[in-house]
């Protein structure tokens, strides 16, 4: 599917780029809940995406030094058993953070994940079908699944 990790990382970066518009909204605009976006606010969308990027970052850190990832096994099992309840708990954690901390992580976490993926041997993620599927699910596929939410939130901010 991908020739090398840089191809994946370029695609991921391009897919993430539209979401960076959220950082340009005021705190007040980020707080407005949008019924057509799961009832989420811009801040909620930021937290939801970042929560899963954070899990992906932990997996990348583990794969940098090992053939497997306990975090990935945990995440897969939790999702299979609890699905939306897991999402709700992650979102509740992000809602407790000060908005400045959400913004700081929004500006740094995606780049940190990309950075870690550059040091993970490609055989452990890019050329490993299950691990690649995991990273796609938590990045580009996840972003695509929430593009409509992003559009609703950005329209609601104007």
Predicted regions mapped to residue ranges:
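Solvent-exposed, charged/polar functional surfaces in cytosolic regulatory/catalytic domains
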Residues: 15-21, 112, 116, 149
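Hydrophobic packing residues in well-ordered alpha-helices of helical domains and bundles
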Residues: 5-15, 99-106, 132, 136-139, ...
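Short hydrophobic/aromatic segments of transmembrane alpha-helices and their interfaces
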Residues: 13, 28, 85, 127-128
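Short, contiguous alpha-helical
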Residues: 31-81, 114-158
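Alpha-helical bundle segments that constitute or directly flank the non-heme di-iron/ferroxidase center
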Residues: 1-30, 51, 55, 61-62
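Acidic/histidine-rich alpha-helical segments that form the ligand environment
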Residues: 12, 78-123
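Short amphipathic alpha-helical segments at helix-loop
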Residues: 1-4, 37, 91-98, 127-131
């Amino acid at each position: 599917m991908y020739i090398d990790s840089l191809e994946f990382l370029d695609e991921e970066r391009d897919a993430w780029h539209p979401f960076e518009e959220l950082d340009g909204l005021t705190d007040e605009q980020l707080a407005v809940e949008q019924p057509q976006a799961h009832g989420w606010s811009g801040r909620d969308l930021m937290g939801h995406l970042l929560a899963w990027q954070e899990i992906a970052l932990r997996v990348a850190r583990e794969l940098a030094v090992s053939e497997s990832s306990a975090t990935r096994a945990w995440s897969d099992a939790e999702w299979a058993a609890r699905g939306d309840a897991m999402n709700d708990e992650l979102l509740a954690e992000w809602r407790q953070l000060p908005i400045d901390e959400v913004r700081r992580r929004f500006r740094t976490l995606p780049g940190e994940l990309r950075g870690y993926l550059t040091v993970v041997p490609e055989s452990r993620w890019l050329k490993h079908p299950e691990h690649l599927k995991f990273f796609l699910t938590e990045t580009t596929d996840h972003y695509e699944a929430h593009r409509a939410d992003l559009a609703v939130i950005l329209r609601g901010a104007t």
